[in-house]
Curated annotation (Swiss-Prot):
Broadest EC class assigned to this enzyme: isomerase
A GO CC term assigned to this protein in UniProt: cytosol
Keyword Isomerase tagged: yes
Pfam family, one: NanE
Record CDD domains: NanE (cd04729)
UniProt protein name: Putative N-acetylmannosamine-6-phosphate 2-epimerase
Record organism: Lactococcus lactis subsp. cremoris (strain MG1363)
UniProt xrefs under PANTHER family: N-ACETYLMANNOSAMINE-6-PHOSPHATE 2-EPIMERASE-RELATED (PTHR36204:SF1)
Length: 234
């Protein structure tokens, strides 16, 4: 699958992020949970899956026939980038044959000492046909990553870095700016409702990832609990 085929596949659809980290209720040392999430997403009509870790990706590949955006989350403290942050993670993801690899493309200091542009160049040299998605937090990062050679950008990290604006919902302003600049973009981050997803779609994005609103029951339940508790009794 090449970039054009992937973008055509996800056009007008929903990519569901199926992830659980250690310490979260749906995380299991033995695995087996995320492929069930992915199977439910596929039955609902999702067009692709975003997944974290080699184990989960392999399990999901056996459960569904959807393309996968693969990542590996690993801390390299004190540096902040942790989404597919070094060539080691790239190598491991390539070995899974996942269709797309997403990586932190912020301009923050990296563990490997490379600039993000140097890292992208090395990946493209080593794996010239691998589709790459840039997880970014602002327009400057997206513009830089796209010019450096990634296939499309994602607003994944908007609101989660010091270089971006914190907000409760999707970063509509950033999405609009990227579409206007004709930079291929997958919307991701805090799309909590079908209405927000509709608005994102109308902006003209190439695709969208929804995670917490679908596959994180703790987050979903908490939102309902907070809403009910905030209502004054009649």
């Amino acid at each position: 699958m090449n970039k054009e085929q992937f973008l055509e596949k996800i056009k007008g659809g929903i990519i569901v992020s199926c992830q659980a980290l250690p310490g979260e209720p749906l995380y299991s040392e033995n695995g087996g949970v995320m492929p069930l999430m992915a199977k439910a997403a596929e039955q609902a009509g999702a067009v692709a899956i975003r997944a974290n870790s080699v184990r989960d990706i392999k399990e999901i590949q056996k459960a569904v026939s959807l393309p996968i955006i693969g990542i590996i989350k690993k801390d390299y403290l004190p540096q902040k980038p942790f989404i597919t942050a070094t060539m080691k993670e790239i190598d491991e993801l390539v070995a899974t044959s996942c269709e797309v690899i997403a990586l932190d493309c912020t301009l923050r200091e990296r563990h490997d000492g490379l600039t993000i542009n140097q890292f992208i160049k090395k990946i493209k040299e080593k794996y010239p046909t691998q589709i790459l998605m840039a997880d970014c937090s602002n327009f400057k990062e997206c513009e830089n990553a796209y010019s450096a050679g990634v296939d499309f950008v994602g607003t994944t990290l908007s609101g989660y870095t010091e270089e971006s604006k914190k907000q409760d919902g999707p970063d509509f302003e950033l999405l609009e700016k990227l579409v206007e600049a004709k930079i291929p973009v997958i919307a991701e981050g805090r799309i909590h409702s079908p209405e927000q997803a509709q608005y994102v779609q109308k902006i003209g994005v190439d695709g969208m990832v929804i995670g917490g609103a679908i596959t994180r029951p703790l987050e979903i339940a908490s939102r309902f609990v907070q809403a009910v508790e905030s209502v004054e009794k009649l």
